[in-house]
UniProtKB/Swiss-Prot annotation:
One of its GO terms (biological process) is threonine biosynthetic process. Disulfide bonds: none annotated. Belongs to the pseudomonas-type ThrB family. It is an enzyme of class 2 (transferase). Keywords: Amino-acid biosynthesis, ATP-binding, Kinase, Nucleotide-binding, Threonine biosynthesis, Transferase. Its EC number is 2.7.1.39. This is Homoserine kinase. It comes from the Bacteria. It holds the Pfam family APH. The keyword Disulfide bond does not apply. It catalyses: L-homoserine + ATP = O-phospho-L-homoserine + ADP + H(+).
Length: 321
């Protein structure tokens, strides 16, 4: 979360007058994050989050995202629930940006991931997948395997400036991963979060109190979401895989939804693909973002060691799972 678009007090109060959420008593911008402008609203009716969607979010996707969040909330998942105005609409315009209000979730995200976080995260991810069965509309994964060759091409001219030989290593990785990628109907599919990093999961008293930031969510292989979490939650800062965290994550997930044998066999290639996806999008931002642009760059090399680990893995035993 972050603030890129300022909102005047008068414009905000006029906007809130369309809702039945009480009178505004205070508001503040949220500094964290990289994609949208976010504000905490305090009203006489409670606390809420106001999001203004910036240019990196396709407005055409917003009804799907908001619909998914509403469905997941209806099915008991602790996630932001879109608040509708008196006219029944959740999506409006404020300060020239698409905007929506959602419910406020208590808790804080873990700055240092421990084994104790991983089982609750796995269980919450499985609960998300189960709840998502109630949402029939599909959204293609715009950053799935079909997008990776184009990202490589867009980074080719400058990618080796980040690390010599990086582009050749990415070429070799794609040559392994893409032919081995499971077909659409090979594994269970459904609605996935696709970005469940620690800063998108809130904890309170040791339990998951909320999952946020659904703006990369899409319809894809459920096990790919697990693979993303293995990358995001189960590696040390130096890129070393922590098998204890991995075991906890998988055990937590399977306490809600057991994996199929085919999903288990596919996890190494899915994890390699997930590492490739985040390496490539970080690399693209690193080499293509001009100074002063509205993007916070993250080091792509954080994912290179992860990718190398996954490429060397042959089965779940390679992960100590």
């Amino acid at each position: 979360m972050a603030v890129y678009t300022d909102v005047s007090d008068g414009a905000l109060r006029a906007f809130l007058s369309l809702y039945d959420i009480g009178d505004l008593t205070a508001y503040r911008g949220i500094a964290e994050g990289v994609e949208n402008s976010n504000f905490v609203l305090r009203t006489t009716g409670g606390d809420f989050i106001l999001t203004l969607y910036e240019r990196r979010v396709d407005p055409a996707d917003l009804p799907w995202f908001l619909g998914l969040m509403g469905c997941l909330s209806d099915h008991g998942l602790s996630c932001p629930r879109p608040v509708v105005a008196r006219d029944g609409q959740a999506l409006r315009t404020l300060a020239g940006r698409p905007a929506a209000i959602t419910t406020f979730l208590p808790g804080v995200w873990p700055r240092e991931v421990r084994v104790a976080h991983c089982a609750p995260v796995g269980a919450a991810l499985a609960a998300l997948h189960m709840a998502g069965q109630g949402f029939g509309a599909e959204r293609a994964n715009a950053l799935g395997p079909d997008a990776w060759p184009g990202l490589v091409a867009a980074c080719r001219a400058d990618g080796d400036s980040v690390q010599p030989g990086l582009m050749a290593e990415l070429d070799a990785a794609l040559a392994e991963i893409l032919p081995a990628w499971p077909a659409r109907d090979d594994l269970p599919r459904g609605q996935i979060h696709a970005d469940l990093f620690p800063d998108n999961v809130f904890f309170l008293d040791g339990a998951v109190s909320g999952i946020i930031d659904f703006y990369f969510a899409c319809t894809d292989l459920l096990a790919y979401d697990i693979a993303i979490c293995l990358n995001a939650w189960c590696f040390d800062a130096d890129g070393t895989f922590d098998a204890a965290r991995g075991r906890a994550l998988i055990a937590g997930y399977e306490s809600v939804r057991p994996l199929t044998d085919a999903e288990r066999r596919a996890l190494p290639v899915l994890a390699a693909g997930a590492a490739t996806r985040f390496l490539l999008t970080r690399l693209y931002d690193w080499v293509n973002t001009p100074a002063g642009a509205m993007v916070t760059r993250k080091d792509p090399l954080d994912y290179l060691k992860r990718l190398r680990f996954h490429r060397a893995a042959r089965n779940m035993a390679s992960y100590g799972l």
